[in-house]
Amino acid sequence: MRLMIMFDLPVATSKDRRNYRRFRRALIDEGFLMIQYSVYVRVCKTKKSAAYMEQRIATVKPPTGIVQTLMVTEAQYQSMHFMVGTEKQDIRNSADRTVMI
């Protein structure tokens, strides 16, 4: 299961930029990886753990802008096609069941 966070936040004022930085930092601290600008994804073991993570992110959401979440299965995530560009080869973004470090 993957939890995807997509957001579009205002950056017109210094307060807006501060809110943006805090939200982005909170996502990274929770283990999310950036797959595109303003699109972050995290692996969750179950739908219940993804819902829990969604609740945690809701506590740090900025007061303005748009923040959306999407839960997708591993198969759905792996069926994503790249029309332009290539996939980031990050071990944390791997679909492998076992990762040897």
UniProtKB/Swiss-Prot annotation:
One of its GO terms (biological process) is defense response to virus. Its EC number is 3.1.-.-. The keyword Metal-binding applies. Mg(2+) binds at residue 8. It comes from the Bacteria. InterPro entries: CRISPR_associated_Cas2 (IPR021127), Virulence_VapD/CRISPR_Cas2 (IPR019199). CRISPR (clustered regularly interspaced short palindromic repeat), is an adaptive immune system that provides protection against mobile genetic elements (viruses, transposable elements and conjugative plasmids). CRISPR clusters contain sequences complementary to antecedent mobile elements and target invading nucleic acids. CRISPR clusters are transcribed and processed into CRISPR RNA (crRNA). Functions as a ssRNA-specific endoribonuclease. Involved in the integration of spacer DNA into the CRISPR cassette. This is CRISPR-associated endoribonuclease Cas2. It comes from Lacticaseibacillus rhamnosus (strain ATCC 53103 / LMG 18243 / GG) (Lactobacillus rhamnosus). The gene is cas2.
